[in-house]
Amino acid sequence: MSCMPVSTKCNDIWVDFSCTGPSISELQKKEPKAWAAIVRSRTNQQTAEDDNIIGSICDKQGLCSKDEYAYSQYCACVNSGTLWAECAFAPCNGNKNAYKTTEQRNILTNKQCPSGLTICQNIAEYGGSGNISDLYQNFNCNSVINTFLINVMNHPFLTLILIILILIIIYRLMSSSSGGKHNDDKLPPPSLIFSNLNNF
């Protein structure tokens, strides 16, 4: 069964890799080197050469750059934009047929996964609202929804706004706790702050 990708976007986080792709026997016949790399990956013996054989959409080379395989089970680790896919994304972490790169192997063998991530072995639903796809991934894991904030630091403007809002809240709390006896200490209204920011 062919898995034609819905997009060929590098690091697309809204892909569930539910399509199993060509059967193992087909893969063995058509792509014997790739199958051998996957077998080595199962026992943590993959090499940099295997990484090149498997490739990815982002690399624009190898098995996982081909439309037929790009969003198949074999490519769930290398083509997923999910942060820490090897740690907490079931189609990658919970699938022995998903090739893990040497870098992903090292993260797992050295136990470098962040604490607090839930590894979902069965995902009932994977997806989310496209307009917040840069910020959130929602995993429905046995009816428990775990939301991970991802890629925030890749959006400096959003990070700056969050920091400004936090500082304003802290300043307000501090000025209100001091009794507000001095009118000079009062924070100007937010509309004035933002109008002053526009002057820069």
Swiss-Prot record:
Glycans are attached at N131. It comes from African swine fever virus (isolate Warthog/Namibia/Wart80/1980) (ASFV). This is Inner membrane protein E199L. Belongs to the asfivirus E199L family. GO terms for biological process: symbiont-mediated activation of host autophagy. It comes from the Viruses. GO terms for cellular component: host cell membrane; membrane; virion membrane. The chain crosses the membrane at residues 150-170. Keywords: Activation of host autophagy by virus, Disulfide bond, Glycoprotein, Host membrane, Host-virus interaction, Late protein, Membrane, Transmembrane, Transmembrane helix, Virion. It is found in: Virion membrane; Host membrane. The keyword Mitochondrion does not apply. Essential for viral fusion with host endosomal membrane and core release. Not required for virus morphogenesis and egress. Induces complete autophagy through the interaction with and down-regulation of host PYCR2. Interacts with host PYCR2; this interaction results in autophagy activation. It is a single-pass membrane protein. Induction: Expressed in the late phase of the viral replicative cycle. Contains intramolecular disulfide bonds.
